[in-house]
Amino acid sequence: YLNLFKFKNMIFQKEIILPSFPRGFHLITNYIKNELPRMTGIINVFIKHTSASLTINENADPTVRIDFETHFNVMVPETANHFLHTLEGSDDMTSHIKSSLLGSSVDIPINNGNLLLGTWQGIYLCEHRNEGGARQIVITVNGEE
């Protein structure tokens, strides 16, 4: 039995500017961990861009990152000639599609400021542009101290 009335719900929110990463899949778990308050609840990690995305996946074997990038480039090739939205380059429309496939946010339970990820799980920034630049991430924690 959980007495929900004894808890005082709080919201914590912070924007993080990630450095520019090359195209590919990059672990950003530590960037998130370093900003977590000592709260218990749920964290939402949201990226404020349409050409990069976030996902949670295996963090141990670096070849996973290479396989992800390779597979997404096969699934959504830049050489496809049916894209109309190409003003910003051949990687523009494909980056929007890849971002839509993976999503712009992840939710993770936290306990006392610790991410409750599985042993082999990490948070990835999926950079779909050749020159994506710095990326803005918003973390929002809904929970209690």
Model-found features: residue ranges?
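Active-site histidine-anchored catalytic micro-motif
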Residues: 5-145
